[in-house]
């Protein structure tokens, strides 16, 4: 804000400063306060009003009545391209498709229509493309210029010899293409797919081949960087399953690497059973493809043993004997382990073995990196840094995060690079180091720009928004995360390694909105998922989240049950950081005998952990905290004794007689116990002291 204010107050020296943003976020108030000094151009300013339409008509040499101009505005919403179309049609109004149909489509001959359909899958058209996509004889000699002269909503760049159809026109033409008879429609999609494939635009090549029902066309593409993509309503995982099941085996044999890449997509989409079936079948198809592809198969089949590092290492050892050069399957464009940005979430599978796993992971990935030219570079350092972080060893964690960043950048391992940014941000938030958090965010944004091969891809978007969204979740500012990470993002049907962490942020969003029941339902359903997705790290996070949710709804018994599970996992490796973030909320549960007796040492360590995480307290997640005092200390032996007798149904006088103390002393002990336990009535004692 200060920089913006300084720029606004600069002397008038002819320098124009332009801010372009889809969403100004927290700067909106700053710009609104500077309204008199800043010239705004909003989306609404680009629409034409009734008087603008009349002026537009006059510039074209015509006139309109106020009624005609008003009808055009109502029909088009003031969208300039649509208004221009209405004026070309002599003021006719109606739905956009209707206008386009009447204005030019019905006036085109069959050849011109076919030519436009063949070009409708491109937003930039060159003469070379026309020669390749439109068969000879479709247009008469010199018909190209006539075609575009008669077609509205096409911008021509004469110098560069390019045509740019407007989105309105493309939408209309693609709807006409969908209505075209099957053979011609498929042939149009097939030719477009070939052009996209030959020009290295794989995403659109696959889309076109899929619509053309051309499985060999799909297999002929370089199927890289497609995790998370959708083709119409079909996910890439579903597409992979369809192609592997229906494409003739004699065709599949010609594309061994593509078969393995489709199997990789199956595992990435968590279709574990289908992955196992197809890998068994493909092993036989690869028998005559040479040792290298059998080595690639062994590399990929290591996923069948995940998260068993010994099993994975044995598969890598088998691959090492077969591969003749670096892997073609595991390359930077396919981020390590489907773009998951947390190695701790992936590989922490057995409580009590967290640091042992770090050592074993280093050994296994050393072999893997030899075979893949450093595909997992930085992953082992990231895991170790995350392990230190959950133990509260933040300085050591930062060192590991920086090492992960340096190593992963050299090998272009985006998963570890983005994971390092996430870890540095988490550590900064836990220490209330906002300058450190800003450095982590800046680092993330710089890396997002430098990994050009991820730009514009679904997996790239998932990875960046995972880091950004997770940090915003810890900051209790989920409303600033990407829209697709909000709303119904807690659904489980599309849960994968790639998007798991961003979906956990949705739980924070639900807590902030006090939708505790929905959060409980989502988390408890997640616990029943495949253990490859729900690791020990994820399970501990979920147990802690359920304890918070039940605590928020006042169900202290259920909250204690889930906190007990969380502490049982956490104390085996002393990974207390996340629980410590909410220790203020958990103080009432820490006092319960069922918790204090089992986890006394863990509770003392959690209270002593050097975490200065203020966001949870400032956000006031739980309505129940609004009216209760903060817990200061545990119950004394006498307070516990009095409270337990009261919970058993005794009156104050009966307690006094039993313990041989005065009734006023009983009242004093109960008052202290109520304050320490965050309760205001005796009925809660039964649940708290069980």
Report each predicted region and the residues it spans:
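Internal alpha-solenoid helical repeat scaffolds
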Residues: 250-420, 426
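Extended alpha-helical scaffolding segments used for macromolecular assembly and cargo binding
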Residues: 183-259, 265, 274-278
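Amphipathic alpha-helical segments of tetratricopeptide repeats
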Residues: 227, 244-248, 280-288, 317-330, ...
């Amino acid at each position: 804000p200060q920089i913006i204010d300084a720029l606004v107050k600069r002397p008038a020296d002819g320098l124009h400063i332009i801010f372009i943003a889809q969403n100004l976020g927290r700067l909106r108030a700053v710009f609104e306060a500077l309204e008199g000094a800043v010239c705004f151009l909003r989306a609404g300013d680009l629409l034409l009003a009734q008087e603008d339409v009349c002026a537009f008509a006059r510039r074209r040499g015509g006139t309109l009545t106020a009624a005609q101009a008003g009808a055009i505005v109502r029909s088009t919403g003031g969208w300039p391209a649509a208004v221009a179309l209405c004026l070309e049609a002599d003021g006719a109004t109606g739905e956009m498709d209707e206008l386009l149909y009447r204005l030019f489509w019905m006036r085109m001959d069959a050849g011109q229509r076919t030519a436009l359909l063949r070009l409708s899958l491109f937003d930039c058209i060159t003469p070379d493309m026309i020669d390749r996509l439109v068969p000879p004889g479709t247009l008469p000699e010199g018909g190209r210029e006539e075609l575009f002269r008669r077609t509205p909503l096409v911008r021509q760049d004469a110098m560069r010899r390019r045509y740019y159809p407007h989105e309105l026109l493309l939408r209309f033409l693609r709807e006409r293409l969908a209505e075209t008879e099957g053979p011609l429609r498929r042939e149009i999609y097939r030719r477009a797919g070939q052009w996209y494939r030959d020009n290295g635009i794989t995403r659109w090549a696959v889309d076109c081949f899929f619509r053309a029902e051309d499985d060999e066309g799909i297999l002929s593409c370089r199927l890289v960087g497609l995790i998370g993509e959708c083709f119409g309503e079909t996910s890439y995982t579903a597409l992979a399953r369809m192609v592997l099941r229906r494409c003739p085996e004699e065709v599949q044999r010609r594309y061994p690497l593509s078969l393995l890449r489709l199997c990789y997509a199956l595992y990435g989409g968590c279709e574990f059973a289908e992955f196992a079936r197809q890998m068994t079948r493909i092993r036989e198809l690869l028998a005559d493809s040479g040792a290298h592809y059998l080595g690639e198969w062994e590399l990929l089949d290591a996923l069948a043993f995940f998260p068993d590092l010994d099993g994975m290492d044995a598969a890598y050892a088998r691959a090492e004997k077969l591969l003749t050069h670096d892997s073609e399957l595991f390359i930077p464009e396919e981020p390590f382990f489907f773009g998951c940005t947390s190695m701790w979430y992936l590989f922490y599978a057995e409580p009590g073995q967290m640091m042992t796993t770090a050592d074993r992971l280093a050994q296994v990935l050393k072999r893997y990196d030899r075979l893949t030219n450093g595909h997992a570079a930085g992953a082992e350092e990231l895991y170790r840094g995350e392990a230190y972080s959950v133990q509260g060893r933040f300085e050591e964690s930062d060192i590991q995060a920086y090492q992960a960043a340096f190593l992963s950048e050299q090998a272009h391992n985006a998963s570890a690079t983005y994971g390092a940014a996430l870890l540095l941000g988490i550590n900064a938030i836990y220490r209330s180091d906002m300058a450190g958090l800003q450095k982590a965010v800046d680092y993330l944004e710089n890396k997002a720009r430098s990994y050009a091969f991820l730009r514009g891809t679904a997996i790239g978007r998932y990875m960046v928004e995972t880091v950004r969204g997770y940090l915003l979740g810890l900051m209790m500012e989920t409303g600033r995360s990407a829209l697709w990470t909000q709303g119904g993002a807690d659904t489980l049907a599309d849960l994968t390694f790639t998007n798991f962490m961003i979906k956990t942020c949705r739980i924070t969003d639900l807590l902030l909105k006090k939708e505790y029941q929905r959060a409980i339902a989502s988390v408890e359903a997640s616990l029943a998922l495949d253990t490859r997705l729900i690791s020990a790290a994820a399970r501990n996070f979920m147990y802690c989240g359920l304890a918070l949710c039940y605590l928020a709804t006042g169900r202290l018994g259920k909250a204690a049950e889930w906190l007990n599970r969380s502490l049982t996992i956490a104390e085996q490796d002393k990974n207390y950081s996340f629980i410590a973030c909410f220790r203020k909320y958990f103080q009432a549960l820490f006092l319960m005998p069922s918790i204090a007796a089992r986890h006394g040492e863990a509770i003392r360590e959690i209270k002593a952990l050097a975490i200065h995480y203020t966001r949870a307290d400032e956000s006031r997640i739980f309505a129940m905290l609004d009216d209760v005092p903060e817990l200061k200390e545990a119950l004394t032996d006498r307070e516990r004794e009095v409270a337990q007798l009261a919970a058993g149904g005794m009156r104050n006088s009966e307690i006094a007689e039993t313990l041989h103390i005065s009734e006023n002393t009983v009242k004093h002990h109960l008052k202290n116990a109520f304050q320490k336990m965050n309760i205001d009535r005796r009925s809660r004692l039964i649940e708290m002291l069980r």
